[in-house]
Amino acid sequence: MCKECDHYDLHYAPGAGVSRRHVLDQLAMGGLASLLSGLPRAANAAKTEDETLRIGYLPITDATPLLVAHAKGYFEEEGLKVAKPELIRGWAPLIEGFAAGRFNVVHLLKPTALWLRYGSHVPVKVVAWAHTNGSALVVQGDGGVKSFADLAGKQLAVPFWYSMHNIVLQYALRESGLTPVIKPQHAMLGPKEVNLQILQPPDMPPALAAKKIDGYIVAEPFNALGELNASARVLRFTGDIWKNHPCCVVSILQPLIEKRPAWAQKVVNAIVRAEIYASQNKEEVAQLLSRDGAGYLPAPAKVVTRAVTAYGQEPVYKDVIRHAEWGNGRIDFQPWPYPSATRLIVQQLKDTKIEGDRVFLDKLDPDFVTKDLVDYVLVKKALARYPDWWRDRSVASGDPFSRQEVLAL
């Protein structure tokens, strides 16, 4: 049994007229445009004169800088009025709320931000990375899976098609001679096929414990939760496949940035400061965010601490980490949005199987997206103000603003 897994039900979100299950299904199929047709246009979201910072977030460690900035009062110290961050119980309602203007700052999966801007015409701008690394592929502890090659014929869950999880997983499967497919769960699979399905993060540990799936790839703390409460075992950490990869990014709508550039700069200043604090105080931050601390996350401190700190020093990961020389952590915190990573994400998405309309992907130019998706000005000013950001282990040596992407199984 998966003890405590029920504490992580993210499906229910109060206060909206659209079925959250329907929204999730539509999002997974790429149908955001039709969903938003009855909502306020995203471009109009900036027209309100209310400058209150309204944060929406999922209860995952990817949201750490937004939550630490709130908990430590960094937003207020920038002169901002801020509402208490609102925990949203799934990607679908978070995306919908952001596009409709309910939230003006959120964390999004980097590929989701790309999909929103170019596939659904929501004017998203990435203003900073929220973290690096921070995810893993876990499998049944007694399932006999020792390598990616052993996943042939298995059922794996990903949190969203437009996610780093889906990109990294499918890369690893292809490199292992396997073919990722998207079929009904009970469909026959070829000898080298691995079936993928969308599953909400809180559903993953109980589904694994009940042997409804053979593994899942997701953000923390659901890997740590699986290890501690669902007899799961980490097969690989995503940061050990794509060195210091982005995952969630801090996002603001472009019309709001253009209307209130000083406001947006203050937001990014506070977030950069929070990432520095999180990088230098991981154990304290884990306790702070947990339900045993300030309660931003429903997970207990034991789970969040493992999710943030347990990595190379753990004997159980001796054969899990293949690139110890990379020197990264289980999750790290640095805000600079490396252009090389955006370029590689676009390139990898073109080779990644995704359910729904993906025609826009075939037309995307990686160099154009690298320049257009990200606002580099705000974050660069914030980094100049808080230069300690470069001390995080995931910042490139030499020129901290440039790096070469490393993707290796």
Q: Language-model features: where?
A:
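Ligand-binding "clamshell"
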Residues: 51, 115-127, 173-174, 178-180, ...
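Pocket-flanking alpha-helical
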Residues: 63-69, 88-124, 135-149, 165-167, ...
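N-terminal secretory signal peptides
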Residues: 1-22
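Short, polar/charged alpha-helical segment
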Residues: 54, 59-87, 116-119, 171-175, ...
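A bilobed periplasmic-binding-protein/Venus flytrap-type ligand-binding module shared by bacterial periplasmic
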Residues: 68-70, 135-145, 246-262
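Pocket-lining segment of extracytoplasmic ligand-binding domains
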Residues: 110-112, 185, 201-305
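N-terminal export leaders
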Residues: 19-34
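Secondary-structure end/capping motifs
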Residues: 258-361
